[in-house]
């Protein structure tokens, strides 16, 4: 799997992401600078990692979404390429128009940094095939603006089309206000594009791929991508 990890000023999770990709796929990821206008030849997966691109000025992800490299990412996605955006990466994908909606301040206006539980809503996506449908996984979050919001019609369409892949839940998989850590509409933690090839999610699966972290639940996302690309080749 040939991966490209984007690097913007203020991003700070690119090396975590590159390490996770290397551990699971066995291949080094290419680091692509925000001013580049092309992606490496043969790229299978583009990852927009977490952090605080451009200091979160204007809006989280707003400046990064207008960086030169994002034109190449939009072209890559329109051609069916796989794109993963995590945390600030999710915000950038929304600001870029690759995903609908926006990430707002957490409902309690506090930064959240801890492990959370997610329910995998379906496993017929490249981004979830490493899990079972309905499986509960534990992954970390670290965000102050992870409250996914969209108009009512958009949320209904996302749910009706099966584009909500991950939701915040209890350890037993229950969905409800008490388990919705940031107030996100419909407890949404991750959504995909209409074609299903672009995923944005707030939690950080890249930080739960090694035993030393005490949990490897994030590994399934990357393993599923590797398997998908093998079968698609």
Curated annotation (Swiss-Prot):
**GO-annotated cellular components:** cytoplasm
Identify the Gene3D superfamilies for this entry. 3.40.50.880
Give all residue intervals belonging to the Glutamine amidotransferase type-1 domain.
3-233
Main localisation, per the record?
cytoplasm
Q: Which superkingdom does the taxonomy of this entry point to?
A: Bacteria
Active-site residues from the entry: 87 (nucleophile), 204, 206
- What biological function has been recorded for the protein in this entry? Part of the phosphoribosylformylglycinamidine synthase complex involved in the purines biosynthetic pathway. Catalyzes the ATP-dependent conversion of formylglycinamide ribonucleotide (FGAR) and glutamine to yield formylglycinamidine ribonucleotide (FGAM) and glutamate. The FGAM synthase complex is composed of three subunits. PurQ produces an ammonia molecule by converting glutamine to glutamate. PurL transfers the ammonia molecule to FGAR to form FGAM in an ATP-dependent manner.
Q: What is this protein called?
A: Phosphoribosylformylglycinamidine synthase subunit PurQ
The lineage, from the top, is: Bacteria, Pseudomonadati, Pseudomonadota, Alphaproteobacteria, Hyphomicrobiales
The gene name reads purQ
């Amino acid at each position: 799997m040939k991966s490209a990890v984007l690097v913007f000023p203020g991003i700070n999770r690119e090396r975590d992401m590159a390490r996770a990709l290397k551990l699971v796929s066995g291949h080094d990821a290419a680091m692509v600078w925000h001013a580049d206008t092309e992606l490496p030849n043969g790229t299978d997966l583009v990852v927009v990692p977490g952090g605080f691109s451009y200091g979160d000025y204007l809006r989280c992800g707003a400046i990064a979404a207008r960086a030169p490299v994002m034109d190449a990412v939009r072209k890559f996605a329109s051609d069916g390429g796989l794109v993963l955006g995590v945390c600030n990466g999710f915000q950038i994908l929304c600001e870029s128009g690759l995903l609908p909606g926006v990430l707002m301040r957490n409902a309690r206006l506090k930064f959240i940094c801890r492990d959370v539980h997610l329910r995998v809503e379906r496993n017929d996506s490249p981004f979830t095939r490493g899990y079972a449908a309905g499986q509960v996984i534990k992954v970390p979050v670290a965000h102050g603006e992870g409250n996914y919001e969209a108009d009512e019609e958009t949320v209904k369409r996302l749910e009706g089309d099966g584009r909500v892949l991950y939701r915040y839940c209890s350890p037993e998989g229950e969905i409800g206000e008490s388990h919705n850590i940031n107030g996100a509409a419909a407890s949404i933690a991750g959504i995909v594009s209409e074609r299903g090839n672009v995923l944005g999610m707030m939690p950080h699966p890249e930080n739960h791929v090694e035993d030393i972290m005490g949990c490897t639940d994030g590994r399934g996302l990357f393993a599923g991508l590797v398997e998908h690309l093998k079968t698609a080749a």
